[in-house]
Structures are given as C-alpha cells and as structure tokens.
Amino acid sequence: MNHKSLVLAVFAAAMASACTSAGHGAAVSRSASAAPAARLTQSHPCAGIAGFVCSTLTVPLDHSGHTPGTLDLQVAAADNVNAPRGVLLFLTGGPGQPGVPFVPRIANRIAPVLKDYRLVMIDQRGTGQFGAINCPALQAAVGSSDITVPPPRSVQDCANIIGPGRRFYSTADTVADMDMLRQALGVQKMVVDGVSYGTFVAEHYALANPAHVSKLVLDSVAPHADPGHTDAFYLVGLRAVGSVLRAACQVKPACAFDPASDVAWLVRHGGDGVRIFDMLVTYEFIDPTYRNPNPARVPRGFGDVIDALHAARLGQPAHLDQLIQGLNEGGDSPSQFSAGLHAATLCTDMRFPWGSGAVPVPQRMPALVMATAKLAANQVWPFDAKTAADDGFVQTCLNWPLTPPAPEASPTSKLPAVPTLILAGDRDLSTPLAWAQEEAASAPLAKLVIVHGASHSIQTREPGDQGRQALYSFLPG
C-alpha cells in the first residue's frame, strides 16, 4: 500500500474526500414538475448501520421531463420517524462523494442532536455503491482530487462513457432530487447541513426552496455564486497557502523562516506549482498543524510539510518529493468517490475563462491564454499564473465536450433569511476561510464560527469541539 492509499484510507474513515473543495459557478434548481410521485421504496434495515432504514428514491434523469430515464438513489434515514424537531438532511462533499457509507461517522460525531432530529443521508446522483459513474482512466488518474491534472484523453473518454446525459449531473439536478427526497419523507421543512461541496448544494437548495428550509448549517464553505468567474483558477485557495502556512509557523516554537517565500521560490525555480498545491490541499487532512513530523495513521516521519518545503529550498528535496508522490496520485474506487461525476458536475456548473461548457472546445484555449496573461502576481502568490491555469478544474473542463451549462446563481443573490450557522477552520486550504466570510456576508441570518487550528470539515474532523458545540447550541434554538 503506497502513501496515497494509506492516506485515503484515513480520509474515508474520517469523512474526508481528499479534496472536496467545491468547485462552484453555480446552479439553481431545475423544475421538478415532470417528476413522478416522490416516494421511498425497497425499504430495509441498512446493513451494518443499526437504527437506520435504507431505501431507494427514484428520480427523473431530466427533471424537465424532456429526456426519458430515471436514476435510483440510495437513502439512509434514522428510524426515529417522529423526531420532535424533524429531519436533518446531511449532505457530503465532492462532488462525487456518497452519503450513506458515512452515516455511522456522522451519527457518532453529532450524536447529541439526534435525539431531537431524524438524520437522513443520500447518495447523490452519480455517486455511491449502486449509482457511481465509473470512468476508469479518469478515476485512476485523479481519484478524488480537484487539482490533479488528468490526461485529456481520459476526460474525453469519460464524457463519452456518460454520453449526452452528462448534462443532467449538475447541482441544479441534485437540488431537484433533494426536494423529491423531502416530499418522500413527508415533511414541509428540514434542516439542511452540508460539508464542503455539500454546502453548495445546501445553499442552492435554500435559494430554490426557501419555504422548505428551517435552518442551514454550512461547514467548510463553497460560496453559492462566482461573480468574477475566477473560481476555476482557485485563486482564493492559492493565496490562502501563504497565510495558512505563515500562521502555522507562528505557533511556538516559531519558524525561523517564511514558508510562503519557500513555496514562491520553489515554484519559480523549477518546482511544479500544481503538484505542490495539490499536495498541500491533501496534506491538511492528515495534519492541520502542517508541522507535525508524525501525524497519526501515516508512516513515521511522513509529516511536517513546512520543514519539507524549506529543506527543498535549501537543496534537499527528498522529503518534499516523498510527500508529492505519496499524496498526489489517484486511486479511489468510484463508489468511494466518483471522478466521473465530479467532472460532469463541475464542467456543467462552473464558468471558465472561455465561458461555459457550451463554448466549442477549439475556442477555449485562446481564451484561457488571454485570461492567464491578465492574472496579476498578487492574485496567485505564492504561486504563479501558470499554476492557476494548469489546475485540475481548468484542465478537465478545457477538454470536456460541448455540454449545455446549468444556470448560474445571480452574482448579487443572497441566501434566504433562515437561521444559518457557518463553520470554518482557519487552516483550511480546500475551502479557505475567505469563502466562509464571503458567504456569511450573503446570509442575512448567519452566525460565523471560526475554529482556530482546524482545517476542513469541522463537524467530523475538528481536533477539539468548538464547532460541534456551536452546532449543538444552534440546532435546538
């Protein structure tokens, strides 16, 4: 088992989808007027999950009804049907991560609220044991990474495997599925709790169905809109590397060097910016301090990425090379994380330097070159413009065939006036703190809780309990 496989095993146990930073551009709900009656079928006790019933929710492939076909989505619901405060729908990340396998982990981590709420989780369309899109070459190349660059042929092959139906794997389609789930559960309102990409789905569900949301919990936030159409460049994440690593170095004993300058030097002296960034975004899942030489459940001496970066700048790259090799490879199975669904959703939802997926492929590269040339140094530092242009978001969708785009959220749209708890770790590179602050400004009834020293996925992975205590206080009120 190589380091990547070992780390991914840790992530699966900890509900980390080794880069579930949500690409977003964004999507609003499709009409579900043509949908069949929403109901849960084939109900049975969930295998290995005591107290939960697993069922099938059948949804239209195309919620407008113009294209025939259905999809079967697996749902797990707690058996406390008459929970006094109703349903808590918990949405996992990606896009590409299933929900049902994480029920035991989530139920354990937020157990104090589940005496009052009925926990429900779902394998979103294109994910999970029974519905994952399987694109073998793309899966092998990128696994669950947003940032790893796939071979162009693997992208094209994946789009062909999915076929014309790839247009129906947008966030808008998932939002329509979620409202069918609400109807099938027989509730008028529910708490919607999302992590990472799950926050994006939750935000868009609330925008499309404000009357059906009692509260929102947004953990490790992807904002619901991208007014500047720059999120494909991952500019906020690139810039966050400098501030996050510097903050980590200020913890005693303080570093005697500047880790952000080390990254900048390496990128400008032959280092592969994309692979370094990809590694750092993955590394946060095993060590939010960025300085622990021996993080739990990985080989001894594997950690302390800050030291590895500094050593590489001083001419000793072996440790950094080990980290890059160990953390930047693909390898997840589709049922753990569907790279095909990930690509289909992002390339339909997002907007790029060339526009949307409706722009012919030959016209995209010239537009990308022009946009990259306009990037200022302070937009990408400590990285460079090439890193921004070469990341997995851009390079995947650069080669994705013509696909009608999902509609965007208005750049000036606000979340509805429902109580909203926003949880953010100040060490998060996947969904940086700046995104949480941006979304808090767009939510009229938001409470932002910043957990210092924590990285991604506060409810399930925070070392302490500040975020969960905030959740426990927020939900009963």
Q: What is the predicted function of each stretch?
A:
Residues 20-22:
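Bacterial signal peptide processing site
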Residues 322-355, 364-370:
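Long, low-complexity segments enriched in small/aliphatic residues
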Residues 272-310:
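P-loop NTPase catalytic cores that bind/hydrolyze ATP
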Residues 222-241, 310, 319-335:
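Flexible "cap/lid" loop of the alpha/beta hydrolase fold
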Residues 7-14:
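Sec-dependent N-terminal signal peptides
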Residues 16-18:
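C-terminal motif of bacterial Sec signal peptides marking the signal peptidase cleavage site
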Residues 1-7:
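Bacterial N-terminal signal peptides that target proteins for export
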Residues 28, 35-279, 283, 292, ...:
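Gly/Pro-rich cap/lid or specificity-loop segments adjacent to the active site
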